[in-house]
């Protein structure tokens, strides 16, 4: 028999609250029956509180960030403690454990010490600003210092750095202030409210893939009330109902991104799209990518950017796998502004292909490049993996011609033998010291997207590595230091190829031989670096 647990207390009613859960028992309760008592009600839940929420079969402590009424149901947006922000989600009441204690937010009272620190800090900042003003107005006159270092334009105050981008108590930011905080390139988020906003879409259906978004994206507000959003994987148009989507697809004839196909091999294709010429498509792409990138902003339009889209082909057409964008004119020498592999295609090597292609374009431009900072956590991992593979392969094979000849394909050897790469590497004439290995190295370097004519030697400079790989010296030094390859020995710097480095090289070669790692072929690239006039680079032209 099922009964409801009823306790008669002073001032309490025998009738339960309509919104309160009632425990159901299969037998009559007795003294030994363990009855779970509710310690709070839904009315007690406020933003900032912490509750235990059912997640993947167990209860996890989560912080309530926001509450909302969606289609007549009360839902809460929660952040799981000690978990990545991309796991934040909307939950309903049935996933909350009301038998465990509700943890209220801590209220930090301003003590006398805190108040005195704030006052002294504000005085120091005022004094510093006065010194800066005087220094700027008077040239050649030294000014007294208060002992605090004055930071340059490229330095960060690590003590006061707001890492999460959340608005601190007492801080107010207008839209104009937020725009002023943006970098001049327009692709980084430094505004506070953008990062702090909660995820607004529950599920998107992209072609045949059902994807759960990670972050907020400014889609139309009417779509946020829908449980599922349908996105066309060719036009990237979005719809709130399946009927609208199917009607659109029955009339849509687009089968690939609206740009020029500049690369195609047996696995992937790349398309170049000008943001000014295809504004709608590129804006839809930015809205989609913002669902999976937390550190980007959409304040600026797409006109100043070129988009390079990677696709795979099926019977239906070319499906977007990922993309990267780059500024038409980058004052800082960045070759990538934003890069993303869609979650349904991640962990399949496509991220490294995007990175390799960006450096392939940089090589054609005869430049060195680096991605715009800061990178996302997944983006940083992908770049570190690419930089590691590139440097390990280059340094090991440069130091050992035997390994180079052993681990490069017979096709490259035949091309070098037959002179098919004579346009890139002139054939040595009589009396030349160039060996057959040098010709082979040139062919393989051209195929891998590196500069031609590598020399087999146990000496190399950082600038040489930069010219071969098109990586910046900063990225090279960062990677060598991370791998613990760069040492200081007897008054000079050396690069040490340890056993761990050789193991990395063998794993890399094994992946290529087993065709687990796809390599792009620069010979299949048909692309000329675009040039723009001053008027074309002007925003809003």
Curated annotation (Swiss-Prot):
What is the recorded post-translational modification?
A: Autoacetylation at Lys-296 is required for proper function.
For biological process, the GO terms are: cellular response to stress; DNA repair; DNA-templated transcription elongation; filamentous growth of a population of unicellular organisms; positive regulation of macroautophagy; positive regulation of transcription elongation by RNA polymerase II; positive regulation of triglyceride biosynthetic process; rDNA heterochromatin formation
Give the residue interval(s) assigned to the motif ESA1-RPD3 motif. 279-300
Q: Where is this region: Disordered?
A: 1-31, 111-154, 413-438
Q: Record's superkingdom?
A: Eukaryota
Compositionally biased spans, kind Polar residues:
12-30, 131-146
Q: List the C2HC MYST-type zinc finger ranges.
A: 229-254
Q: Where is the MYST-type HAT domain?
A: 196-529
Q: Which residues carry this modification: N6-acetyllysine?
A: 296
The EC number(s) given in the record are: 2.3.1.48, 2.3.1.-
Where does this protein have compositionally biased stretches of type Basic residues?
115-124
Annotated binding of acetyl-CoA, by residue = 337-341, 346-352, 376
Record keywords: Acetylation, Activator, Chromatin regulator, Chromosome, DNA damage, DNA repair, Nucleus, Transcription, Transcription regulation, Transferase
UniProt site positions, description: Important for catalytic activity: 338
- Tell me what reaction this enzyme catalyses: L-lysyl-[histone] + acetyl-CoA = N(6)-acetyl-L-lysyl-[histone] + CoA + H(+); L-lysyl-[protein] + acetyl-CoA = N(6)-acetyl-L-lysyl-[protein] + CoA + H(+); 2-hydroxyisobutanoyl-CoA + L-lysyl-[protein] = N(6)-(2-hydroxyisobutanoyl)-L-lysyl-[protein] + CoA + H(+); (2E)-butenoyl-CoA + L-lysyl-[protein] = N(6)-(2E)-butenoyl-L-lysyl-[protein] + CoA + H(+)
Q: Which Pfam families match?
A: MOZ_SAS (PF01853), Tudor-knot (PF11717), zf-MYST (PF17772)
The family note in this entry says:
Belongs to the MYST (SAS/MOZ) family.
Q: What is known of its domains?
A: The ESA1-RPD3 motif is common to ESA1 and RPD3 and is required for ESA1 histone acetyl-transferase (HAT) activity and RPD3 histone deacetylase (HDAC) activity.
Q: What does this protein do, in the record's words?
A: Catalytic component of the NuA4 histone acetyltransferase (HAT) complex which is involved in epigenetic transcriptional activation of selected genes principally by acetylation of nucleosomal histones H4, H3, H2B, H2A and H2A variant H2A.Z. Acetylates histone H4 to form H4K5ac, H4K8ac, H4K12ac and H4K16ac, histone H3 to form H3K14ac, and histone H2A to form H2AK4ac and H2AK7ac. The NuA4 complex is involved in the DNA damage response and is required for chromosome segregation. The NuA4 complex plays a direct role in repair of DNA double-strand breaks (DSBs) through homologous recombination.
| UniProt-listed PANTHER family | HISTONE ACETYLTRANSFERASE, HISTONE ACETYLTRANSFERASE ESA1
Subunit structure of this entry?
Answer: Component of the NuA4 histone acetyltransferase complex.
- The name of this protein is Histone acetyltransferase ESA1
Species this chain originates from: Candida albicans (strain SC5314 / ATCC MYA-2876) (Yeast)
> Lineage of the native species?
Eukaryota, Fungi, Dikarya, Ascomycota, Saccharomycotina
């Amino acid at each position: 028999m099922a009964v409801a647990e009823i306790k008669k207390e002073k001032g309490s009613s025998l009738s339960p609250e309509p919104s309160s859960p009632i425990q159901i028992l299969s037998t009559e309760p007795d003294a030994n029956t363990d009855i779970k008592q509710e310690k709070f009600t839904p009315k007690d839940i406020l933003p900032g509180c912490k509750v235990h929420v059912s997640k993947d079969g167990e209860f996890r402590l989560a912080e309530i960030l926001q509450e909302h009424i969606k289609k007549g149901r009360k839902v809460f947006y929660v952040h799981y403690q000690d978990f990545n922000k991309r796991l934040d989600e909307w939950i309903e009441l049935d996933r909350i454990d009301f038998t465990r204690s509700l943890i209220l937010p801590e209220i930090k009272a301003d003590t006398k010490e805190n108040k005195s620190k704030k006052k002294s800090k504000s005085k120091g900042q005022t004094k510093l600003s006065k010194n800066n003003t005087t220094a700027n107005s008077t040239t050649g006159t030294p000014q007294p210092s208060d002992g605090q270092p004055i930071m340059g334009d490229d330095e960060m105050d690590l003590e006061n750095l707001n890492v999460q981008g959340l608005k601190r108590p007492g801080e107010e930011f207008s839209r104009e202030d937020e725009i002023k905080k943006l970098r001049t390139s327009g692709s980084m988020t430094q505004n506070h409210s953008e990062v702090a906003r909660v995820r607004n879409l529950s599920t998107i259906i992209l072609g045949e893939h059902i994807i759960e978004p990670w972050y907020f994206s400014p889609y139309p507000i009417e779509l946020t009330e829908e449980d599922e959003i349908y996105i066309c994987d060719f036009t990237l148009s979005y719809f709130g109902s399946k009927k609208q989507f199917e009607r659109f697809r029955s009339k849509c004839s687009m089968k690939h991104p609206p740009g020029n196909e500049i690369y195609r091999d047996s696995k992937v294709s790349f398309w170049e799209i000008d943001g000014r010429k295809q504004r709608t498509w590129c804006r839809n792409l930015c809205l989609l990518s913002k669902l999976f990138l937390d550190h980007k902003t959409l304040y600026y339009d797409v006109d100043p950017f070129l988009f390079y889209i990677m696709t795979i082909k099926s019977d239906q057409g070319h499906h977007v796998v990922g993309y990267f964008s780059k500024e038409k004119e980058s004052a800082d020498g960045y070759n990538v502004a934003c890069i993303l592999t869609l979650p349904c295609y991640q962990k399949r090597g496509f991220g490294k292909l995007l990175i390799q292609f960006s450096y392939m374009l940089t090589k054609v431009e005869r430049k060195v490049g680096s991605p715009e900072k800061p990178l996302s956590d997944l983006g940083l991992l992908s770049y570190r993996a690419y930089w590691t593979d590139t440097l390990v392969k280059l340094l090991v094979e440069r130091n050992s011609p035997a390994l180079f000849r052993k681990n490069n394909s017979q096709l490259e050897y035949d091309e070098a033998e037959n002179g098919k790469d004579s346009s890139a590497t002139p054939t040595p004439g009589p009396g030349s010291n160039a060996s057959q290995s040098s010709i082979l190295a040139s062919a393989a370097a051209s195929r891998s997207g590196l500069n031609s004519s590598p020399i087999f030697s146990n000496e190399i400079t950082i600038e040489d590595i930069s010219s071969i790989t098109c990586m910046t010296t900063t990225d090279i030094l960062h990677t060598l230091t991370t791998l613990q390859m760069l040492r200081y020995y007897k008054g000079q710097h050396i690069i040490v190829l340890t056993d761990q480095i050789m193991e990395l090289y063998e794993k890399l070669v094994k992946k290529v031989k087993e065709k687990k790692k796809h390599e792009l072929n620069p010979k299949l690239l048909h692309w000329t670096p675009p040039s723009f006039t001053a008027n074309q680079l002007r925003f809003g032209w």
